[in-house]
A protein has these predicted regions:
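Interhelical loop and adjacent transmembrane-helix boundary motif
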Residues: 1-7, 168-207, 211
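Non-cytoplasmic
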Residues: 69-70, 146-185
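Transmembrane alpha-helices and adjacent helix-loop boundaries
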Residues: 55-61
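Transmembrane-helix boundary motif in ABC transporter permease subunits
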Residues: 19-49, 62-64, 77, 112-114, ...
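Transmembrane alpha-helix signature in integral membrane proteins
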Residues: 5-34, 53, 98
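C-terminal transmembrane helix and the adjacent membrane-cytosol boundary/short C-terminal tail
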Residues: 103, 110-121, 125-129, 137, ...
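Membrane-interfacial helix termini and adjacent extracytoplasmic/periplasmic loops
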Residues: 61-98, 168-172
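Transmembrane alpha-helices
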Residues: 21, 104-109, 113, 117, ...
Length: 225
């Protein structure tokens, strides 16, 4: 791997870690609300959350680029406050990746929270436990498999992002150039050895992360049938 590839690896890991952290903080309360609410708006919110699963990445990337650019809703607001717009920046990349990976965090958490049910939290409420205490002491510990799955899927998905990253962040070394774009650059320049090395690394990393999740889940089912 060249120096630029190592720099792309660093950017990729930073992007995946920050995206996962942001989604963990935002997706957890959203997933809990979706799992426990009876609001009619829940169906609409679920559809919006799942939209990145079926929407072409370039479509989402285009709208994010427009929104984050100098004439967009977010970028224009930033510039009116004397701040630079977020198009072709690492911060903008994190925002776009957060939106694109949203269903990979929310859906596993929602399913895990729904599996826990409300019986134990209602029992805790009769003992004057607050909703916050019930969530952190009962719901989250019982949902740890779903939490692990959500974190792993989000991180692995962000590692391989291409379309959204290219549209919103471009290809700026040290800022927005990630491994998937570096792989594309190698392939475009007919450097198949370099492209193969990066592709194999991404494949191995993704496989090992998924393998660890399935192995831990299977072990948990054996210990707690």
């Amino acid at each position: 791997m060249s120096a630029s590839d190592w720099l792309a690896l660093k950017t990729t890991l930073e992007l995946a870690a920050l995206t996962t952290l942001v989604l963990l903080m935002l997706g957890t309360p959203l997933a809990w609300w979706l799992a426990s609410t009876r609001s009619r708006m829940a169906v609409v919110i679920e559809a919006v959350v799942a939209l990145p699963l079926v929407l072409p990445p370039t479509v989402l990337g285009f709208y994010m680029l427009v929104a984050l650019g100098p004439n967009g809703l977010i970028g224009g607001l930033m510039e009116s406050l004397g701040l630079p717009h977020l198009a072709f920046t690492f911060t903008g990349l994190v925002l776009a990746s957060t939106l694109y990976s949203l269903p990979f965090m929310v859906q596993p958490l929602k399913d895990a929270f729904a599996a826990v049910g409300t019986r134990m939290t209602e029992a805790a409420a009769t003992l004057r436990a607050s909703t916050r205490d019930s969530f952190f002491s009962i719901v989250l510990p019982l949902s740890r498999r779903g939490l692990l799955t959500a974190i792993t899927l989000t991180f692995a998905h962000t590692l391989g992002e291409f379309g959204v990253v290219l549209m919103v962040g471009g290809n700026i070394p040290g800022q927005t150039r990630v491994l998937s774009i570096a792989l594309y650059d190698h392939a475009e320049s007919m450097d198949y050895a370099g492209a193969g090395l990066l592709a194999g690394g991404l494949l191995a990393a993704s496989f090992l992360m998924l393998l660890s999740v399935y192995a831990l889940n299977r072990r948990y089912r054996v210990v707690h049938p």
